[in-house]
């Protein structure tokens, strides 16, 4: 087993670049590792949104996180979407670019393209892996850089798989040279829902086994977020503080991978900036403490 990389003081957690906090982030300049934006929100070449993002880029590293590449769609990539992303990448020069291991597009009955307007899970099959690898390679060639691909919070399951999710993502990274974006809250949400559907007994053990299986050298970024328990389902809604079990799983992850750029994802019911900074500081403490336990 490879030794865990030593903690690096240069690796720090980041938060989302969201409208209510732009002014304070530019004025206060807290010590963040990066800020994250949703790529598609900034595809328009001009206007105030892009201008404010450029100002943010002068103050912080920017991570572009997308939801629209549909890397697993057998119908193919949307060339227009990719070109818009490429222009944004050229303008902003982000520190990372990422999207999801998901599909969203297909051939519509009678012609045209059907779009789900959501992230749907790709089956973990050899055929699906071939499709996604081909698309990841095409995106990386156009952007002239590697991207990171995120594991999905999935509320439906395909009946048949050739492999498990960690094996699928490891092979995707091996074939394409892409990085992996490990969303620990997504893993926890999936495990809780699988437990409620009778597919597993111990969610914590399942997530730890997933993290143990993933290739540590491929992990380019980690996401932490909150979720909502509706009673029947657990929903990955990014609307609350990171839950205690997710923090424990994060400590397990960095115990294997070392210090990895980590995003505190909070997109709904946005709290005061200081709350986000406190969450980011907790992630920093976990990464840089000798035992990996947050202060």
Residues covered by each model-derived region:
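N-terminal pre-domain/capping segments
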Residues: 1-87, 295
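Hydrophobic faces of well-ordered beta-strands that scaffold small-molecule active sites
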Residues: 11-17, 33-37, 62-65, 95-99, ...
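Active-site beta-loop-alpha junctions enriched in small/polar residues
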Residues: 18-20, 38-42, 67-70, 100-102, ...
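Acidic (Asp/Glu)-rich catalytic clusters
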Residues: 24-30, 46-64, 80-95, 137-142, ...
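Gly/Pro-rich active-site loop or hairpin
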Residues: 44-46, 76, 120-129, 190-257
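Active-site acidic/histidine proton-transfer and metal-coordination neighborhood
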Residues: 78-180
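Acidic/histidine-rich catalytic cores of soluble enzymes
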Residues: 140-233
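C-terminal helical cap(s) of enzyme catalytic domains, especially alpha/beta-barrels
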Residues: 273-294
